[in-house]
Structure formats: structure tokens, C-alpha cells
Amino acid sequence: MGLKNRFIDLCNKHFSLLVLGGGSASFFLINIILKDYLHAENYGLYSIFITYISLLSSFGLLGFEQVIIRNAKITSNKIILSKSLLIPIIFSSLFVSILGSYLFINNYNISISIIFLISITFLVILTKLIFNLFRLMSKFTFSQIALNFWKLSLFFVLLILVLRKNVVNLEDVITTIFWSLVITMFMVFGLLKKVKFRSNLKAKRIFSQAILFLLSLITISLINFGDRFFIESRFGLEELGYYFFFINLFLFPFVLFQSYIGFKEIVSFKLSYNHNLLVQKLKSILKYSILFGIFLLSFSFFVDYLEFYSIDLFENLEMILMLIVLGVVKMVYSLLSSAMGAICDNKMLFKINLYSIISILILIPVIYYYSSTITITIMFLIVLWFIRCVIWYKQLLLYEN
């Protein structure tokens, strides 16, 4: 009985990780299912749509959600927020929803109305806000449910469609995402009595912080998602779908661990930070990331060789190797980002954003003129992430000194 209780207690403590893992596994399988059941161009359109909602989830509140995280006070299990944040949050979410939807509809031939897309975009932004509010309250399970419910729902709906009709179309996918986000909104009722507003922040401070965070979010979003928009514009929707499929197989597993590291290590660095600890963790994460990359490549070889699933490993080996290298670099970045998130002030944030923007502006013309293949584009992406890692590391060294 004691063992059973310990097991239940362990599950309760780490259930948020189970939800995170379930959502990530569902998303992984969703992309594989849709690759097999959607037409190549529709899969490319699905890829750009997922990129769009991921992008809007990142900076849909124009940096104000980071102001909430930085300045919120937790007392008696309640979140105390500044009243001055209300209008900026409402305005930014509506503005981004309308502008983002307008740009998407005008650039991509997707068979949904602009009103429907505005609604989805607005729900995506609110979902990320709900996630952050639950996270502030240390309700990690609820935060992960809010963030991952649409992935879990979509996976089960796709299973039903495949088993019953053996037919899946893009409209079914988008409609399922919409209704899953609508259901997620009911989690707001769990926050109504937990969030209180007080006048404790000046508007000038709120907007100055939001601008700094927005710059940071734009730079990270640009190198996180910009490659997909570039590949679509340079090589077309079908090639984007092809690329999206391979990043799902060979980069997404790294991103899953990257999210976990960011989730865990920022708390560790807030409790105690020093350079020796950082170097020790960097060596460890580099070693295990390389080993994981070797495992991923070996596992894929056996899957392809034994014909469990057709990956065309050798035909795409150069691109796959570049994606694994990118995954290793992003793992290192996730640790540096956690350390920076734990100790940085506005001055440090401004510097790293400035250096990052300069490096991106220098490389953009080079990427534009020399990216003749998807593999070369990934190589430039690795360079961008490596430069970002160097910038972060140098700033952390200055902090220590």
C-alpha cells in the first residue's frame, strides 16, 4: 500500500510532465498522420498554418505577458496584477488577431473566412495567457493542459476520422483546433477568483518593459519560425511540407527536451547561479545532446531499413544531419536562455536583443542570395543560433565579472 501511495504521489507531482509529453507525442503523430493523408500542397498549407499559430502564441500580446510574469505578485494563492495592464492586453490581443489574420488570408489560399481566422488567432493568444497565469500560481498541470489540449484533441479526432472514413481534410483539422481552443477557454473560470488587480505599476514602466520583451520575442520568433516562411516563399508549399515533416522527425524531439530544460533550469538558476555551475551544465547538456542525436539517427536508420515507415534516410541524409546539429545547438541555447532569464535585467536584455538583431540583419542578405537548397538554409540557421549562443554566453560572463 505504501508503494502504491508513493506511486500516486509521484504521478501527482509530475503529472504536468505527463501532459507535456502526451501533447508533444500527439503533435508528433499528428504530423505523421497528416503527411500520409493530406495532399502535398495541403500538408504545406497545414505546416504554414501551424507555424502561424505558433508564432502568434509567442508574441500575440506584444510582450505584455512577459511584463505580467516579471511583475506579478503571488499572495495567499492569488495573482496580483497591475490595473494598467488590462487595456494593453485587450488592445494587443485584438490588434494582433486582426492584423495577423489579414496578412495570412492575403498571402495564403486557405478556405476559411477571415472572421473565423481572427477567432482562432484570438483564442490562441488567450490560451497562452491562461497557460502563463496558471504557471504563475504553480499550477503546472493546469498550465500544460491549457497549452496542449488542442494537440491531444486533434490527435484523437484524426484517429477517429482515419479509422471510420480513412479520409482527412484540412478543414477538419482547423475546425477541430478551433473547438478545442473554445473548450480550453472554460479554464478561465478557474482563474476568476484567483486574479486581482491593483494600481501598482506606472504605464511608462509597463510599456518600456513590454518593448524590450517584444524585441526579444521578435528576434527569437524570427529565427525560430522565419525559416519556414522563407522556405515557403523560395521553394513553395510542397517543399515546405517536406521540410516540416523532417523537422518534426529530427528537430522536434530536441525541442521537447529543450522545453523541459527551460521549464526546469530557470528555477535552478534563480535559486543559485554561478559561472562554474553553468559550464558544468553546458558540458553535460552538450554530451547528452550529441548522444541523443546519434540515437535518433540510428533509430531512424532501423525504422527505414526494416520498412516500418518510409523516411528515405539516405536520400535526405545531409538535411537530416544538419537538423540534428541544429537540435544540439538549440539544446545549448535553452540552457543559456534559462540562465539569462533567471538573472537578466533590462540593460542586459537590451544588449542581447541589439546584438541579435544586428547579427540577423547582417546574415539576412547572405541567406537570401546563397540559400539555393533547404540544406544550405538550415546551415545558415545553425550559424544564427550559434551566434545567439555566443552572445548569451558573453553576457553571462560579464554578469559574473
Predicted segments, located by residue:
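Signature of the first transmembrane helix
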Residues: 6-62, 211-238, 244, 248, ...
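Membrane-water interface segments that mark the loop-to-transmembrane alpha-helix transition
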Residues: 12-23, 49, 54-104, 112, ...
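Small-residue-rich transmembrane alpha-helices that serve as helix-helix interface/gating elements
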Residues: 171-185, 246-249, 324-325, 358, ...
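Transmembrane helix-bundle signature of multi-pass secondary active exporters and lipid flippases
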Residues: 50-58, 243-259, 263, 292, ...
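Helix-loop junctions and terminal segments of transmembrane helices
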Residues: 27, 31, 60-76, 250-274, ...
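Alpha-helical transmembrane segments of multi-pass membrane transporters/permeases
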Residues: 13-24, 79, 117-121, 134-160, ...
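Interfacial segments at transmembrane-helix termini and the short loops linking adjacent helices
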Residues: 40-42, 103-117, 300-331, 375
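Hydrophobic transmembrane helix module of multi-pass membrane transport proteins
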Residues: 87-215, 325, 329-341, 350-355
